[in-house]
């Protein structure tokens, strides 16, 4: 982004402020000044001349001119330029002049005729060819002005008309300050820094009620990518008014190549000032209906605006010749759009151009700049006296409406910044930035300028306060080391133990990217996390939002390894998932693909299976001291397509969702060329919450334990966990129990029952149990089962 001093002086009184001070100001505010150019030092003795006579010299390419260079003062100038014409105002270098290209002028005799100067093109006096048209690179430049009487300016220095002696600042904008692609935003910043009043010499133009109409349809291909669609109609007059040369120079100083069409140049000016790109169309050349769609051109898909089957505009470029606004145009249709930045960055790459429009379409600007934009466009047209009338802006699509009101306490600001700052000082920092501050006790409520799409939270406000306060004014404080009692971080200790266990079990710890695409995030939202964090300006569609699960990243890593020849893997990852409103959850995900256990020496090869992955989960629960008698596994009948419809379960603890355990769908495995894969993902925050944090060390009996086995029939509809407490109540010596077998035959299957065998362990701390004591407890179990109407085999 380039701003010039003379343009700033339209809005600010810079009479007591040097260029060096402006540069320091911009750098202090976080806008890095990459380059400064002082055009006033590039040339000397350049004046405005009027070509009154032009005669070709026979047999040569030369033309002999009589050029007025002052009141009753003339010079004979010979030139080979192809565009020498009478009654034109040109840039004349007089003898003794020094030009930016290194040339020093002196009188020169050619064919016996003394040439007393030279007509200049812009590339001879300091402008690069990159901002000049092909004609401008070869021809003499002719001066037009809508502000000055050119006859009266003959003999004066060119800068009195062209503003060529300007001083430019090329500013590098960070992505979060894309709002400064509207030059007016930098005016606010500089005014605020120097405590200057902004002079808004805006032309007061009355906006009429809409009398003309047009329909702008959105094709399904683009409707999700469009944020704003606005338009208006402008009546024109005096359309043959030439484009002012001072405006032309300002565009060139701003690194913008002027177009042959002056209306496109005026649109570029308004875009540089407001940030809003414009599509200008001759309203009489469209049939009352436009369509925004996508079309493949030269094998590249581009977003275009069409009238019927004809392309009116390829977004980022100027209007097609057939629909351009020209000097014959009576009514101009102005279309203003804002689209998804990722789509427009793709458009910019496909077009392989960087224009005033593409630079702004592809950045996260305020989507509702149309009012500011049309004010600037209308203001410039009014300066040219080309404005007949203008209708009120009609907005047909307006999707985005950012929340721009945030509150923070003074204490919070002081705590974050580490400075003693008062409410009055904070308010004084935002004098001209269109950020309103109201105060209630010690709470400050900020109503943020809607152009500042980078400010959307308390931390951003604190950073903004620090920026305006001045980073150099925040005194550096050495770190203060305070001794304190070492805290017991149970969560960290458990995670460390968990990591050690999984590594010991042969798992590799992986770290994957926290950002993912929106669609897969919706698909894999197993924990039903609400309000995902979507980036304002992501680098790509694959990195649009913070993930709400670890499973998708785990599966992608397994697929990547399989494609690179590593098909048998065991991975785990511990990471946090995020959402808006401060949501943060710590998850563990582990997965096995191919062989779960491999021992080449003993020829043991065990493929991944549900029993293995569930045993790892049970070990994790045991590490967290979770009471597994309250843990249940429920099949999810509505699993996503990527998950096996039957081999999957939601793991719950007293109806609280701990996590998920599942096998991938065989079709998905086959499509991605991976071996059978089993995944488990759990919520570590919940495990910590339900963990038994009070550990009681039990005395170990020195006496020999005794065991008994019992088998009984149980309906398949009854969960063993629901009867075990009643079955084992009122026992004196039971120390442990374990289900060791489950059996059913054909007849039992018909009756929907199974036989469970449970091993019971008995012992005592103070004596060796007698057979009678063991039998008494066992008899109680039999009676309990009888009460439960359970048949013992």
Swiss-Prot record:
Residue positions binding Mg(2+): 454, 460, 463-464
Gene Ontology CC annotations of this record: phenylalanine-tRNA ligase complex
Main location: cytoplasm
GO biological process: phenylalanyl-tRNA aminoacylation
Keywords of this entry: Aminoacyl-tRNA synthetase, ATP-binding, Cytoplasm, Ligase, Magnesium, Metal-binding, Nucleotide-binding, Protein biosynthesis, RNA-binding, tRNA-binding
Keyword rRNA processing: no
Cofactor note (record): Binds 2 magnesium ions per tetramer.
Enzyme class: ligase
Domain tRNA-binding: 40-159
InterPro entries, per the entry: aa-tRNA-synth_II/BPL/LPL, B3/B4_tRNA-bd, DNA-bd_dom_put_sf, Fdx_antiC-bd, Fdx_antiC-bd_sf, NA-bd_OB-fold, Phe-tRNA-ligase_IIc_bsu, Phe-tRNA-ligase_IIc_bsu_bact
Domain called B5: residue spans: 401-476
Signal sequence segment: none
Xref: PROSITE patterns: B5, FDX_ACB, TRBD
Family: Belongs to the phenylalanyl-tRNA synthetase beta subunit family. Type 1 subfamily.
Complexes and interactors: Tetramer of two alpha and two beta subunits.
Name the UniProt record assigns to this protein: Phenylalanine--tRNA ligase beta subunit
Species name: Mesoplasma florum (strain ATCC 33453 / NBRC 100688 / NCTC 11704 / L1)
Gene (UniProt): pheT
């Amino acid at each position: 982004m380039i701003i010039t001093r003379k343009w700033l002086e339209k809005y600010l009184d810079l009479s007591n402020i040097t260029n060096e001070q402006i540069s320091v100001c911009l750098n202090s505010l976080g806008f890095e000044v990459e380059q400064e150019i002082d055009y006033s030092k590039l040339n000397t003795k350049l004046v405005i001349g009027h070509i009154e006579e032009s005669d070709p010299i026979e047999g040569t390419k030369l033309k002999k001119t009589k050029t007025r260079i002052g009141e009753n003062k003339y010079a004979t100038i010979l030139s080979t330029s192809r565009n020498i014409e009478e009654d034109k105002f040109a840039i004349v270098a007089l003898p003794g002049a020094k030009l930016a290209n290194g040339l020093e002028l002196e009188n020169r005799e050619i064919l016996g005729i003394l040439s007393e100067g030279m007509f200049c093109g812009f590339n001879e006096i300091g402008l690069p060819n990159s901002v000049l048209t092909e004609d401008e690179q070869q021809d003499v430049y002719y001066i037009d002005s809508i502000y000055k009487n050119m006859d009266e300016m003959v003999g004066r220095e060119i800068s009195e008309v062209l503003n060529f002696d300007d001083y430019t600042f090329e500013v590098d904008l960070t992505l979060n300050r894309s709002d400064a692609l509207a030059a007016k935003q930098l005016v606010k910043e500089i005014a605020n820094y120097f405590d200057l009043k902004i002079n808004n010499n805006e032309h007061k133009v009355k906006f009429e009620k809409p009398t003309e109409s047009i329909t702008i349809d959105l094709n399904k291909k683009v409707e999700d990518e469009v944020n704003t669609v606005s338009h208006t109609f402008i009546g024109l007059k005096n359309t043959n008014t030439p484009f002012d040369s001072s405006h032309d120079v300002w565009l060139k100083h701003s690194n913008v190549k002027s177009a042959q069409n002056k209306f496109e140049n005026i649109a570029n000016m308004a875009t540089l000032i407001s940030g809003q790109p414009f599509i200008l169309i001759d309203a009489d050349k469209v049939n009352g209906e436009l369509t925004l769609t996508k079309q493949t051109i030269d094998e590249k898909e581009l977003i275009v605006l069409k009238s019927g089957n004809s392309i009116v505009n390829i977004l980022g470029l100027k209007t097609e010749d057939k629909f351009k606004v020209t000097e014959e145009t009576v009514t101009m249709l102005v279309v203003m759009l804002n689209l998804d930045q990722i789509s427009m960055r793709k458009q910019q790459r496909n077009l392989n151009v960087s224009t005033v429009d593409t630079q702004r379409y592809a950045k996260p600007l305020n989507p509702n700049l149309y009012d500011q934009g049309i004010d600037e466009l209308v203001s410039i047209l009014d300066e040219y006296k080309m404005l007949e009338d203008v209708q009120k802006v009609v907005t047909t699509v307006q999707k985005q409406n950012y929340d721009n009101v945030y509150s923070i306490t003074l204490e919070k600001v002081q705590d974050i910044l580490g400075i003693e700052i008062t409410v009055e000082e904070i308010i004084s920092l935002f004098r001209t930035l269109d950020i309103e501050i109201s105060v209630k006790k010690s709470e400050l409520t900020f109503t943020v300028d809607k152009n500042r799409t980078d400010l959307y939270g308390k931390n951003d406000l604190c950073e903004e306060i620090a920026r305006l306060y001045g980073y150099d004014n925040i005194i550096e404080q050495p770190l203060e080391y305070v001794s304190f009692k070492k805290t017991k971080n149970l969560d960290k200790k458990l995670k460390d133990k968990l990591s050690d266990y999984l590594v010991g079990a042969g798992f590799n710890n992986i770290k994957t990217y926290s950002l993912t695409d929106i669609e897969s995030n919706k698909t894999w939202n197993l924990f039903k996390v609400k309000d995902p964090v979507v980036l304002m300006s992501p680098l790509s569609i694959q990195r649009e939002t913070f993930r709400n699960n670890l499973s998708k990243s785990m599966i992608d890593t397994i697929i990547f390894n399989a494609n690179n020849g590593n098909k048998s893997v065991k991975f785990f990852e511990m990471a946090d998932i995020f959402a808006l409103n401060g949501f943060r959850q710590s998850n563990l995900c582990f997965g096995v693909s191919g062989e779960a256990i491999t021992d080449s020496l003993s020829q043991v090869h065990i493929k991944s299976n549900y029993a293995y992955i569930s045993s790892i989960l049970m070990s994790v629960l045991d590490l967290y001291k979770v009471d597994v008698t309250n843990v249940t596994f429920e099949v999810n009948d509505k699993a996503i397509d990527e998950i096996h419809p039957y081999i999957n379960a939601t793991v719950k603890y007293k109806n609280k969702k701990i996590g998920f355990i599942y096998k991938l769908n065989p079709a998905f495995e086959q499509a991605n060329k991976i071996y059978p894969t089993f995944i488990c993902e759990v919520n570590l925050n919940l495990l910590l919450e339900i963990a038994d944090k009070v550990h009681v060390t039990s005395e170990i009996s020195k006496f020999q334990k005794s065991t008994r086995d019992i088998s009984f029939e149980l309906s398949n509809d009854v969960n063993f966990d629901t009867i075990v407490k009643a079955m084992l109540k009122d026992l004196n010596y039971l120390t442990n129990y374990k289900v060791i077998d489950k059996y059913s035959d054909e007849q039992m299957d018909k009756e929907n029952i199974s036989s469970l065998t449970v091993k019971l362990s008995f012992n005592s701390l103070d004596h060796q149990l007698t057979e009678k004591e063991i039998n008494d407890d066992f008899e109680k179990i039999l009676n309990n089962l009888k009460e439960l109407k359970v048949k013992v085999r």
